Regions:
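Conserved catalytic motifs of ABC-family nucleotide-binding domains
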Residues: 100
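ABC ATPase nucleotide-binding domains
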Residues: 171, 178-221
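Conserved ABC ATPase signature
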Residues: 79-83, 87
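H-loop (His-switch) and adjacent beta-strand-loop-beta switch element
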Residues: 153-165
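H-loop/switch region of ABC-family ATPase nucleotide-binding domains
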Residues: 140-141
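Conserved ABC ATPase "signature" region
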Residues: 60-75
Length: 221
């Protein structure tokens, strides 16, 4: 905590402006954002359908399609105040994906969700990665998920300590100083869920062949 993860997400989306340096985005880049916290006046009546239109004008069919894509179709008329933690997060995913983003920024997307809900939401992230062309920047402090479900890791501690493939990062001196040998040895047993392996230079080997790898990108801060 306090390493700059959420600040990085907000700088990426433009929610915050840098006080020094600069952030460059491709012109016309569409960004979907699932914040760590969303401030809502819970005393006001608010349906999921209405929440989906607070930041843009979308048709009923667009809203229905976005909710369907994240497994939340039945919630479109539900009161936001009555949603479980996992249901609310799915709605936030739908709210982010309705813009058909080029880049999806997820800031601790499973915070406040129970274990089974976490598993389901990480499966949803994997589904989005595999079925859309969106790049994904996921902010997380869960090292097991970071190492098992990513292509590129960026490790922050007030600055960029190290970056690269999971296998390269967990061997880096900066990572070992930050988390210790015990963490590195524990994480060494993780199983990557892709049907390929990453070389340290980012090249991918699958079924005995090396090829360039691009499924929209998937990075962790």
């Amino acid at each position: 905590n306090g390493s700059g993860k959420s600040t990085t997400a907000k700088l990426t989306t433009g929610v915050l402006k840098p006080t020094t340096g600069s952030v460059t985005r491709k012109p016309g880049l569409r960004i979907g954002y699932v914040p760590q916290k969303l401030t809502i006046d819970w005393t006001l009546p608010l349906t999921v359908e209405r929440l989906m239109t607070l930041t843009g004008r979308y048709s009923a069919s667009e809203i229905a399609a976005a909710l369907e894509a994240v497994g939340a179709a039945r919630l479109h008329k539900a009161a936001v105040q009555e949603l479980s933690g996992g249901e609310f997060q799915r709605v936030l995913f739908a709210r982010a994906m309705i813009r058909k983003p080029d880049l999806l920024v997820l800031d601790e997307p499973v915070q406040g969700v129970d274990f089974s809900g976490e598993v389901a939401l990480y499966e949803l992230v994997r589904q989005i990665r595999d079925t859309t062309q969106s790049g994904i920047l996921m902010i997380s402090h869960d090292l097991h998920v970071v190492m098992a479900e990513t292509d590129t890791v960026i490790c922050l501690n007030g600055h960029v300590c190290c970056r690269g493939t999971p296998s390269a990062v967990k061997r880096s001196p900066e990572y070992l100083r930050l988390f210790g040998e015990r963490a590195a040895s524990t994480l060494a047993i993780y199983q990557h869920h892709h049907d390929h392996e990453h070389h340290d230079d980012g090249c991918v080997v699958a079924e005995g062949h090396a090829h360039e790898h691009d499924h929209g990108g998937h990075s962790h801060g």
